[in-house]
Design a protein with these regions (language model features):
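Beta-rich strand-turn-strand
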Residues: 1-5, 11-13
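Functional cleft and adjacent loop/helix regions within the main domain
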Residues: 7-8, 40
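Alpha-helical elements of the RecA-like P-loop NTPase motor core of helicases
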Residues: 10, 60, 120
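A glycine- and Lys/Arg-enriched "phosphate-lid" helix/loop adjacent to the NTP-binding pocket
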Residues: 13-31, 39-91, 137
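NTP-dependent small-molecule kinase module
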Residues: 68, 91-137
Length: 137
């Protein structure tokens, strides 16, 4: 199964947007680790990937989307509002990496300013992790 964001919303979006209390999002780190431990113990292979772009690259992508009639539906006022919280999201992501990277399910942060590189690196990361977990060389 592939989960996109999934249970990490509590320690990212909900934390930054104030949708939960500090007690709740702080507790979520433990709950996430416990849940992923259950998945791992039941035989799931967990690969966690974060595609990281720079603030400058995000701006370039936003402007490109706005200018393209085939893609401007992808950019909303909420995207611009969230961009203003870049530093808060970056801090929350850094906390998430530190607090939810057990040996059996570490985060892989991939530089993603160049989409082709990010795609190849993500596929390479998945293949290597699966190979290691399945004992394939």
């Amino acid at each position: 199964a592939i989960f996109d964001r999934s249970w990490y919303g509590r320690v990212l979006v909900e934390r930054i947007e104030g949708f939960c209390s500090k007690t709740e999002w702080s507790r979520a780190y433990r709950e996430i680790n416990e849940f992923e431990r259950v998945l791992h113990d039941d035989g799931a292979i967990i690969v966690k990937i974060w595609l990281q772009i720079t603030k400058q690259e995000q701006m370039a992508r936003f402007k490109k989307r706005e200018a393209d009639p085939m893609k401007n539906w992808k950019i909303t006022e909420e995207d611009w509002r969230n961009r203003d919280k870049w530093n808060a999201y970056l801090k929350a992501a850094e906390d998430m990496f530190v607090k939810t990277s057990p040996e059996f399910a570490p985060w892989q942060v991939i530089p993603a300013n160049f989409k082709w590189y990010a795609r190849v690196k993500a596929l390479d990361t998945v293949c290597k992790r699966l190979g290691t977990a399945l004992g394939v060389k």
